[in-house]
């Protein structure tokens, strides 16, 4: 995360809501001295007050075989980002920068059992289909008998038990109001511009 505390977000509810709103995450881990990176959509679980993003990977993914013994990982959710031109500032002698929002969760990873994996897939579909309303939601009931179970064999589920949760919302908070608002104006209708104005 960014070292400047002005960009730091520590409100747990805000951070979890951000991940839920940006559920396609990057999973980074080091296992046996080798770095691994994978991507997956997640569903956030509240397990008796313990927060855990559930995810799934193809059985062909290089990280998947390590799920059975577990490992430590970081899950990174990213949101809007934008290049900021110094031409947009009122102040002189500035340099370009990048504004962005991201949240990282660190913890230990364990495999999901078959029932947990099925629940994850059902919940993930429901979560994402809800974003498509008023479209009638897709469910696996629409699939031919046995097809879902057959496809299930091609993936493995995992759960990251969150021990550290941090966010960086870098929106030019370190700039004078005139510079920050000038940059927001320069971005026009870019989604991050509205965040910079508030």
Give, region by region, the residue ranges found by the protein language model.
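Short beta-strand segments
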Residues: 21-59, 75
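Short glycine/proline-enriched turns and hinge-like loops at secondary-structure junctions
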Residues: 35-37, 66-69, 172
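Short, basic/aromatic recognition patches
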Residues: 2-26
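Short, surface-exposed beta-edge/turn micro-motifs
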Residues: 22-24, 70-73, 155-157
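Short, structured beta-strand-loop surface elements
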Residues: 59-123
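C-terminal edge-of-domain segments
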Residues: 110-198
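Beta-strand secondary-structure signal
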Residues: 54, 74, 106, 157-161
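A generic local secondary-structure boundary/capping motif
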Residues: 16, 93-94, 147-150
């Amino acid at each position: 995360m960014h070292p400047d505390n002005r960009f730091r977000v520590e409100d747990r509810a805000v951070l979890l809501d951000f991940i839920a709103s940006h559920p396609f995450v990057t999973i980074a881990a080091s296992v046996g001295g080798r770095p691994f990176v994978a991507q997956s959509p997640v569903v956030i679980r509240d397990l008796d007050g313990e927060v855990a993003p559930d995810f799934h990977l193809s059985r062909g993914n290089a990280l998947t075989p390590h799920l059975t013994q577990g490992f430590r990982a970081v899950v990174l959710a990213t949101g809007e980002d934008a290049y900021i031109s110094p031409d947009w500032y009122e102040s002189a002698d500035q340099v370009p920068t990048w504004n962005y929002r991201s949240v990282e969760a660190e913890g230990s990873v364990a495999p999901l059992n078959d029932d947990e994996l099925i629940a994850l897939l059902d919940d993930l579909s429901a979560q994402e289909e809800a974003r498509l309303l008023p479209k009638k939601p897709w469910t696996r009931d629409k699939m031919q008998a046995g097809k879902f179970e057959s496809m299930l064999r091609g993936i493995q589920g995992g759960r990251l038990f969150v021990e550290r949760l941090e966010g960086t919302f870098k929106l030019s908070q370190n700039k004078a109001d005139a510079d920050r608002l000038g940059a927001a104006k320069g971005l026009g209708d870019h989604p991050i511009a509205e965040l910079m104005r508030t």
